[in-house]
Amino acid sequence: MTVDALTQPHHLLSLAWNDTQQHGSWFAPLVTTSAGLLCLLLYLCSSGRRSELPVFNPKTWWELTTMRAKRDFDANAPSWIESWFSQNDKPIRFIVDSGYCTILPSSMADEFRKMKELCMYKFLGTDFHSHLPGFDGFKEVTRDAHLITKVVMNQFQTQAPKYVKPLANEASGIITDIFGDSNEWHTVPVYNQCLDLVTRTVTFIMVGSKLAHNEEWLDIAKHHAVTMAIQARQLRLWPVILRPLVHWLEPQGAKLRAQVRRARQLLDPIIQERRAERDSCLAKGIEPPRYVDSIQWFEDTAKGKWYDAAGAQLAMDFAGIYGTSDLLIGGLVDIVRHPHLLEPLRDEIRTVIGQGGWTPASLYKLKLLDSCLKESQRVKPVECATMRSYALQDVTFSNGTFIPKGELVAVAADRMSNPEVWPEPAKYDPYRYMRLREDPAKAFSAQLENTNGDHIGFGWHPRACPGRFFASKEIKMMLAYLLIRYDWKVVPNEPLQYYRHSFSVRIHPTTKLMMRRRDEDIRLPGSL
């Protein structure tokens, strides 16, 4: 079910174009006039070849700006994209909040992902205003050193044997704290609870136990991403030349900068303390202590070169909390809506974790749980078009599709619901990928953390989400505890709802489930 944006609670409504009303009567006329005059000037002064693709949501001849078209895209994007690509295997252009965007069918994804002229970092830096104070996380993401990508791709992989068990132990305590021990059936706001669970668990591995239990840091980790998304969207309403000025006048801009300042105040002393400890040990010829968290891994990877430690951590929170939460909640809800899965999943968890404990190898062996999650991601991807990138120069695909320099381009997720690829695509089949793993030719791509052209929920290598390996491990840990410790069922007469806005398709924040404590827990090897 799609929920109309006008019925959303305030924290969601603030993400919509209705936010312009919050700025008083001066805001809309000023932005409309400014944007219109600037667009007209740019159009008259522009030269070079333009795209010949049709625009799905064009502005009419009497409209001075594209504001109405952008607003319509935000409200209708998932249904428009699904409608177009269910009937057409060819590109289409849309007017989106950042300008024109060419969306390609997934049949062009293989060629798209290999094009170096299409830059994802340019998208992140441009649409999230990396040059402005408060967006420090995106400034660090888009630095030429690409330190964050290196840490996520290398350290989070090689250090997994060291962090899986302590992370599972931390998640165990957090789950008890959040979900409680009541053995009576009761309704819980599972979206909010899972968001808190992911925030606290991610923070533990990002900044270590000291900050992971600091309520002020947890509040920043949880809310900075939302503040940043709101402000980024509001700034995209304005002509580029005016955005720095507007950013200093907007209340959200002030809030964003304050969050970054406080994050630095909390994190910098820990960084300095660790560096002093390291230098002191080395001066004495002693091996410095090593911490199992991303602070350590950033220090190792930077090798003494400067980087923005606070910006890096805020970027990691932005990337690691909300996407992970959506898949965790979506996976749990899908399992609960198919209660015949509960015991087979519990049997798998008992056997695998009971025999092997918390190790990367054990998490790999949770094949049914892995299949359930990958199917949840296929049925409801987090975005209806993914791998957004900007053209660094004019680009022409082999089929003649032309993308002008500076234009946004993305790939539709249409293949994930294509009946020629997936039998009964609308059906949630939890064993779908488990069966595929029995075929040696498909076993690799059938795993949640691996990508191919038939399933781009995490993108497609080399444009895939670099944090998917960690997210896969983390989600399986949390779900294992949630399924073993608690009974679950749906709330009667409460259908599953999604929040659809622009490219995003998310589990609705008002989602609830019923639960109660079971008289069982995960028993590790050697336990009684």
Curated annotation (Swiss-Prot):
Main location: membrane
Positions with a binding annotation for heme: C465
Keywords: Endoplasmic reticulum, Glycoprotein, Heme, Iron, Membrane, Metal-binding, Monooxygenase, Oxidoreductase, Signal-anchor, Transmembrane, Transmembrane helix
Transmembrane segments: 24-44
Tree of life domain: Eukaryota
Pathway: Polyketide biosynthesis; lovastatin biosynthesis
Membrane-topology annotation of the record: Single-pass membrane protein; Single-pass type II membrane protein
InterPro entries registered for this protein in UniProt: Cyt_P450 (IPR001128), Cyt_P450_E_grp-I (IPR002401), Cyt_P450_sf (IPR036396)
Family listed: Belongs to the cytochrome P450 family.
Protein name: Dihydromonacolin L monooxygenase LovA
Organism: Aspergillus terreus (strain NIH 2624 / FGSC A1156)
Upper lineage: Eukaryota, Fungi, Dikarya, Ascomycota, Pezizomycotina
